[in-house]
């Protein structure tokens, strides 16, 4: 998922805020989310280390959607990350929808929280270097 961090840096510019809210992701199942994004003309899909990543730059599905590979312990699962204004600053919001076992889903969410924190550190380092 290292490539995801690099590509997400270009998409998000701020301190991360974490919110796991599977109801707010807008779909009842991971399969429904995937099917809807496949129909979205604004969705750009790529495969990164077995993960299906959909980048949607505008519209109701706006954000970066990361779908677990079939071999992932939390599969089927999707993590949606998107920018949101919180307290006057742009932050990374995150929503998860996971059909796998709870412990694996919890680990998946923690993994993405760490990725978000790394993005924030990378951005702060870039700001400090200017």
Question: What is each model feature region?
Answer:
Residues 73-80, 91-93:
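Short, surface-exposed coil-to-beta transition loops
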Residues 1-4:
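Positively charged n-region of N-terminal signal peptides that target proteins for export
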Residues 79-89, 116:
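A short, surface-exposed beta-strand/turn
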Residues 86-99:
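Acidic/histidine-rich, surface-exposed loop or edge segments in extracytoplasmic proteins
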Residues 19-77:
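N-terminal secretory signal peptides
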Residues 14-16:
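N-terminal signal peptide c-region/cleavage motif recognized by signal peptidases
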Residues 97-130:
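C-terminal partner/receptor-binding element of secreted or periplasmic proteins
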């Amino acid at each position: 998922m290292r490539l995801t961090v690099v590509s997400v840096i270009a998409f998000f510019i701020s301190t991360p805020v974490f919110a796991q809210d599977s109801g707010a992701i807008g779909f009842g199942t991971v399969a429904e989310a995937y099917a809807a994004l496949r129909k979205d003309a604004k969705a750009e899909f790529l495969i990164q280390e077995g993960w299906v990543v959909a980048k949607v730059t505008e519209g109701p599905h706006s954000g970066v959607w990361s779908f677990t590979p079939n071999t992932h312990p939390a599969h089927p699962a999707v993590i949606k990350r998107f920018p949101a204004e919180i307290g006057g600053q742009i932050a990374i919001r995150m929503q998860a929808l996971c059909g796998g076992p709870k412990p694996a889903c919890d680990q998946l969410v923690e993994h993405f929280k760490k990725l978000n924190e790394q993005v924030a550190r990378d951005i702060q380092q870039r700001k400090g270097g200017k």
